[in-house]
């Protein structure tokens, strides 16, 4: 039980950090990275459209969730159509299921 709680705390911290970096990206460029660029746009400059006018590396690497999976990022989001969706698929490793972990709505 404590291990699962620790994993949930880590997911919340990771999503908060990534959320801050996404807001910086958006403030510099006027848009969040689209789904096809994903969170990798925070690490390496996108080479596909829409390309940011003012790109800076905002993180050295995108963390994996505590279960070893990539965080799910969608922009525009399905849940947050004016922003983005960012969540962990949780222990079942399947998106859009009951055990997904969302830290904040963006």
Where do the language-model regions lie?
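Amphipathic alpha-helical segments typified by the pilin-like N-terminal helix
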Residues: 1-13
């Amino acid at each position: 039980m404590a291990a699962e709680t620790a994993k949930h705390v880590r997911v919340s911290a990771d999503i908060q950090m990534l959320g801050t970096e996404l807001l910086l990206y958006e403030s510099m460029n006027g848009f969040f990275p689209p789904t096809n660029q994903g969170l990798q746009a925070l690490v390496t400059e996108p080479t596909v459209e829409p390309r940011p006018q003012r790109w800076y590396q905002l993180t050295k690497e995108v963390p994996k969730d505590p279960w070893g999976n990539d965080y799910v990022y969608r922009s525009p989001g399905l849940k947050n159509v004016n922003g983005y969706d960012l969540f962990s698929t949780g222990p079942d490793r399947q998106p859009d299921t009951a055990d997904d972990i969302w830290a904040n709505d963006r």
